[in-house]
Amino acid sequence: KRRIGYVSPEMHRAYMKDLPAIEIVASGLHDSIGLYVRPRPEQIGTCMDWMRVFGIEALAERTFMTLSSGEQRLVLLVRAFVKDPELLILDEPFHGLDTGRREQVRAIIDDFCMRPNKTLVMVTHYPEELPSCITHHKIM
């Protein structure tokens, strides 16, 4: 679990809680649904760094339930990236995102997966959403 970052529609439903976005992101450091361990200042710094990468640092203190579905998805994506996983499993990662955000997130995924020892498994109904880092794909 420690080496895996994961986003799915099921995870999205599990997080329909009234927690600040920063806590949801920080829960990715502990592989938990919800935050049960108070993060250290350097961990909060890492969370904020990743929120900046995704352009959502202004949402840090907003509660998840007050965010749009696209903003919620971005928070969950940041949660998946925050621990620098070796394996990213992204199930419909672009669901709820507008075209501009899809392109931004696809570029982030590409940059991340070009780093050494990174693997991406992604599920999508739309082949045009596949990042360029994808080397193998299966159409069903």
Where are these regions (language model features)?
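Conserved ABC ATPase "signature" region
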Residues: 26, 41-59
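Hydrophobic anchor residue at the start of the ABC signature
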Residues: 77
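Conserved ABC ATPase signature
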Residues: 63-67, 71
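Helix N-cap at the start of a conserved alpha-helix in ABC-type nucleotide-binding domains
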Residues: 99-101
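Q-loop/switch helix immediately C-terminal to the Walker
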Residues: 17-34
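Catalytic Walker B motif of ABC-type/P-loop ATPase nucleotide-binding domains
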Residues: 88-92
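Conserved catalytic motifs of ABC-family nucleotide-binding domains
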Residues: 84
